[in-house]
Amino acid sequence: LIDDAVARVIRSKGGFIWACKNYDGDVMSDMLSTAFGSLAMMTSVLVSPDGKYEYEAAHGTVTRHYYKYLKGEEASTNPMATIFAWSGALRKRGQLDGNEALVQFSDRLEAACLDTLNAGIATKDLVGLMEGVEAKAVNSADFVAEIRRRLEEKME
């Protein structure tokens, strides 16, 4: 039964792929990502029977942060899911086209993101969840700047 499966997934250490129909996958992925920290860390890949792929951030829009931005106020929106959706799509495009440079760029972009988090630099939604490092909360622009700096180092 689905309720038992969800309970087992939440208690598990992972290591498996769970294929769901669209609605079930949407509801369960949101619940699971929240149980493990932040919906903003979750990406989604939709694969059609005819081989088409769609990569997306699972969280949708963050309208309250956008309205703060429009007012000139600081926002601390976590861009990780969006970045990983793009990197996943770019990697897949590189694989389909035999473009190894694009695949490597995607790998380096994701590594730069993880290096930033491992250095203790994160948006506000993640700082309280970080263990083992002295965490520093930064706004969206500063977080992206930190990722960019690390990506540029990896591209040299």
Identify the meaning behind each predicted range:
Residues K71-T77, K92-E156:
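Internal helix-turn-beta structural module
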Residues D4, R8-R108, D115-T116:
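Glycine-rich phosphate/nucleotide-binding loop
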